[in-house]
């Protein structure tokens, strides 16, 4: 599943960044006239999740991350609605990519039943159709051997659960709900794939929510990303309930070439 947003939200993001307050590290921000004026030396920031969760996510998401800034955040305690701990993991700085573990609510931990994941799958199944790619010349969608999955869209605000998820995505990304696209559910059967590509130029960020588990394959791959120890290429393994956020544009509005991504073949089971 994925959800993307338009470039028109850049001004909103800058406005939110200007209002950012991290009291324990007031010397961290020297100038916030533009995104690329954040910090000049390495700083590690720890905050109390109850008070500054949103500020921390905003700082980690919007800072250029081409500097030596390092972000860290304490885990969110388990609760009845979210019996597993929820926490944010920085995957790579180029592109800016993060995984929010246990993003979707798990109601019955013992039975491994994830109501939000299963609910979205049940809404999507009746209307699934072959996925398409946009023709660069005509602008129209067409089937392609580069994308062999199937998918469908879920109307915004379809029901209470969909509304809650859309609200959570907005809070996670600090992007207004009205600037996001409708939820799109994608299904990859065994052997299906989506070859590396760039998201449309009208998008600045994408959130991929994993609705199911697979034993082998199905990773989201960033072939041009800068990984650990300068190794080229990063992959994210799907885990039911997790959400992957990555930014297709740099803070200055230019396209990030390292945001090129694809989906590996599923070698066992189906992936939503």
From Swiss-Prot:
Gene3D superfamilies for the chain: q2cbj1_9rhob like domain
Q: Which cofactor does it need?
A: Fe(2+); L-ascorbate
Molecular function in Gene Ontology: iron ion binding; L-ascorbic acid binding; procollagen-proline 4-dioxygenase activity
Q: What is its main location?
A: endoplasmic reticulum
- What ranges does the Lumenal topological domain annotation cover? 81-272
**Which residues participate in Fe cation binding?**
197, 199, 261
Name of this protein:
Probable prolyl 4-hydroxylase 11
Source organism of the structure: Arabidopsis thaliana
Q: Coding gene?
A: P4H11
